[in-house]
Every structure is written in C-alpha cells, then in structure tokens.
Curated annotation (Swiss-Prot):
Its main location: cytoplasm. One of its GO terms (cellular component) is cytoplasm. The keyword Lipoprotein does not apply. This is Cell division protein SepF. PANTHER family: CELL DIVISION PROTEIN SEPF. Gene3D superfamilies: SepF-like protein. Residues 23-49 are annotated as: Disordered. GO terms for biological process: division septum assembly; FtsZ-dependent cytokinesis. Keywords: Cell cycle, Cell division, Cytoplasm, Septation. It is found in: Cytoplasm. Belongs to the SepF family. The gene is sepF. The lineage of its organism: Bacteria, Bacillati, Bacillota, Bacilli, Bacillales.
Length: 156
C-alpha cells in the first residue's frame, strides 16, 4: 500500500483529500506508463516502382532470337522445349513428319509453353510458332490455302 493511500485514509480536510487524491492519480498514471508497452511508430516504405515496359535497343538485340526448326522425329521435341526455356521463339515446320508424331510434338510443346507462360500459334499448314513469355505475337495470318491431310481427322 502506498503512502498516498494512507494519507488519503487518515486526513479529513477537503484540501488534504484533494492533494492525496491528486498524488494517488499521479501514481496510478505513472504505473500505467511503466506497464504499457512503448508506442509503435508507423514505418513507411518507399513504393515499388512500376515495371517499366521500355527496354534499351541493345538489350532487345541480345534477347531476341527466333529459331527455325524442322523436326523429323518426336525425340527432337525436348530440344525444341530447351530453346523455349532459353527464352527464344521457335517456328516449327512439321510437314516432314507423320501426322501422329506431329500431333504428339504439338501436345508436348503446348504443355511446355503453358508451363513457361508462353504461347503457341498455328501460322500455316503443319507450321507452328511457339513463344516464351518475353515475346508478344501481334496480328494473325488468314488461312487462304487448304490444308492437305492424309486422314479425314483434322485436329489442327
């Protein structure tokens, strides 16, 4: 029990009670300040700069490559995927392959471009363009020529 509480209990005059009450309240306030954790300060971080779409010409020259390939077997699909992983666009001519193997390669490359966030587009009969996420394809090629297939099943 603190001394101010004792004084408050024993003194009868209003001035003395006020003085004792004041000292009691002051002690309570001091105790609360000691018990309260320090106030938290707001910390501000600088805002992240938005991603710039401007690339220097020299950088663009270094990263822009288009690889033209004409695979003959399905086993060459992994090499094509490696080009895509290396952030190079690939144009694939599948005319010298059987239709079954060409379909398998397109399926494999579709999964590859999905995994890397790229795109695959048909640009001609049995000709496809696969691009990684750093290459944008703008426009479309209209199909003015008929596609000649060995079978009646047209998957593409």
């Amino acid at each position: 029990m603190s001394w101010s509480k004792v004084k408050y209990f024993f003194f009868d005059t209003p001035e003395e009670k006020e003085a004792a009450q004041y000292s009691y309240e002051k002690e309570q306030t001091d105790m609360k300040k000691q018990q309260d954790p320090p106030e938290q300060q707001d910390v501000t971080f600088p805002k992240a700069q938005p991603k710039q779409n401007v690339v220097s010409i020299e950088t663009a020259k270094q990263s822009s490559k288009v690889v033209l390939l004409e695979p003959r077997t399905y086993s060459e699909a992994q090499g094509i995927a490696d080009h895509l992983k290396g952030r190079r666009a690939v144009v694939i001519n599948l005319q010298r392959m059987s239709t079954d193997q060409a379909v398998r390669i397109v399926d494999f490359l579709s999964g590859t471009v999905y995994a890397i966030g790229g795109d695959i587009q048909k640009i001609g009969p049995k000709t496809f363009m696969c691009t990684p996420e750093n290459v944008d394809i703008v426009g479309a090629i209209s199909e003015l020529f008929g596609e000649e297939d060995d079978t009646n099943i047209k998957r593409w």
